[in-house]
Amino acid sequence: APQRPVVILDIDEQSLRKLGQWPWPRTRVADLITRLTDLGAVVIAFDVIFAEPDRLSPVLAAEVFRDLDEETRNKLRALPSNDQVMADAIRQSKVVLGETGLPIVVPQSGAQPPAVGIAALGSDPKPFLFSFPGLLRNIPVLDNAAAGRGLFSIRSERDGIIRRVPTVMLAQDTIKPSLTFEMLRVVT
């Protein structure tokens, strides 16, 4: 059988019918990462953003379900968050997380994302790049675990047609790689 160098795992209607509505618990996403890695994936990328903590983490259940006894609450609080479980899976694989440029600056909690390793030689390229004043990124526990981060923002021309997908863009005055460009960096 011929090898397939690229496989796209699509969260489609059939997946949603079988596994439930999106967003899935981060533990399920962690299982996907682990399974893909076990199957030989050399790089895994997400073109979705995990911008908020998982609403299904055990510690949140301990607070939300009022009828739980204190012993059960304490057991739930002692479990790792679903985000930590996913971060652990990310660390065991080569995962590139997606980010998206925004037309406005949106305040986000947490530390700044890890530095991007892009150097520019010669004149300043910033005036020639697609530019986004804002950036929507993943929560820090996931960001810090990832092998890379890349933008999956695209812009159409005035007629609504997308003719170019740049390899680098500008977001919050920082040169950032596209998702696919960052995947190439991480895999090599």
Task: List the predicted regions and their residue ranges.
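Non-transmembrane functional regions of envelope-associated proteins
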Residues: 1-188
